[in-house]
Regions:
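Juxta-kinase regulatory segment immediately upstream of eukaryotic protein kinase catalytic domains
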Residues: 1-35
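A cross-family kinase active-site recognition segment
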Residues: 2, 112-175, 193-195, 224-225
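Active-site acidic catalytic loop and adjacent metal/ATP-binding pocket
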Residues: 39-52, 59-60, 183-230
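Short acidic/glycine-enriched loop/turn segments that link adjacent beta-strands
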Residues: 41-44, 98-102
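A conserved alpha-helical element in kinase catalytic cores
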Residues: 57-99, 115-131
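Conserved short submotifs of the Hanks-type protein kinase catalytic core
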Residues: 101-112
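Hydrophobic/aromatic-rich alpha-helical bundle segments in the mid-to-C-terminal region
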Residues: 143-144, 282-295
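Active-site activation/catalytic loop segments of kinase-like enzymes and analogous catalytic loops
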Residues: 229-258, 268-286
């Protein structure tokens, strides 16, 4: 569930048009000596480390402007350009909106995706989430939509199951409690309001643990405004997958320690329903592992929810 082994079939550096590669080199001020595609993630866009002829390294992301994910990439570029320098995120050096392609060049961050089953690496992630809440409250992007506006229509998986024929392979506990799950799911937006800039897609493959022990948070493609605790709770199923007492973690972490447990359960319920529904859709052609990831996420979150609710 960490996402580290979830790799889409990414565009490669040599698949970019010659004119786009030439413009990247021109703006970078040096020729590209080598390009290494980065593993992990579910987007099929280009994501690569570029080794430049003057000894510098940069990180490039690019996608065809007619691609179905182009709007997501554009949001990421716009968000990265407006993040404060104190945010634990790679700096955007420049972006290009050339005919046919969206391109972003970031500072290259050495490191590896954190392992949530390693106490020191998990501690670094948890410290970074506390830093995000402190640095990004109030939101430096006050014009963003709220999490209820962005995610309210999406996080209704249990309701859809309840209103239609539930899937034949739905687990017994979810089937037995479907109406109650749909009711609890419907309340999550009541608790989620806030003025923190949220990432909303924190996974280990969207973070890098640097050699100095600090975490860099990547891929700000789904930002919105909401309660500061949302990002930690959304990451918690990936932590729970390693057998860690996540209820205790939430009860002691500064971002979540004073949050009503009902609010946490409602949001977990909404996440579980979303993943349960999405995992049953056809897989995107260039991201074959996405539905498996969502199925695992649904299973872990539903199991945890059952223990929390004691239904």
């Amino acid at each position: 569930m960490d996402g580290n082994d979830n790799s889409a079939n990414r565009i490669r550096w040599n698949e970019l048009p010659d004119v786009v590669r030439a413009e990247i080199e021109h703006r970078s001020g040096a020729r590209v000596r080598a390009a290494t595609t980065q593993p992990g993630g579910f987007s099929h866009g280009l994501a690569a480390r570029l080794e430049l002829s003057d000894g510098r390294d940069v990180f490039v992301k690019a996608i065809d402007s007619d691609d179905s994910l182009a709007a997501m990439y554009r949001t990421e570029l716009e968000t990265a350009a407006r993040l404060p320098s104190t945010a634990p995120a790679p700096a955007l050096r420049f972006s290009l909106d050339t005919p046919g392609w969206l391109v972003a060049i970031f500072d290259y961050v050495p490191g590896h995706h954190p392992r949530l089953d390693r106490p020191a690496e998990l501690a670094a992630v948890l410290s970074t989430i506390e830093q995000l809440a402190a640095t990004l409250t109030p939101s430096p992007l006050p014009d963003l939509p709220t999490i209820a506006q962005d995610y309210g229509p999406q996080l209704q998986g249990w309701r859809r199951f309840a209103e239609h024929q539930p899937p034949a392979d739905l687990d017994d506990w979810s089937r037995r409690n479907l109406d109650k799950l749909a009711e609890l799911e419907s309340t999550w937006t009541d608790h989620a309001a806030g003025e923190t800039l949220l990432h909303t897609d924190l996974r280990p493959d969207n973070m890098l643990l640097r050699p100095d022990g600090a975490i860099a948070v990547l891929d700000w493609a789904w930002p919105c405004r909401g309660a500061a605790w949302i990002d930690l709770v959304a990451l918690s199923p990936a932590i729970a997958a390693h057998g860690i007492d996540t209820d205790r973690l939430l009860a002691t972490h500064p971002v979540t320690s004073d949050i009503d447990p009902v609010a946490v359960s409602a949001f977990l319920c909404a996440l579980a329903g979303y993943w349960a529904a999405k995992s049953r859709e056809p897989a995107p052609p260039r991201s074959p592992s996405l539905r498996r990831y969502q199925a695992r996420s649904a299973r872990v979150t539903t199991d945890w929810l059952g223990r929390r609710l004691r239904w």
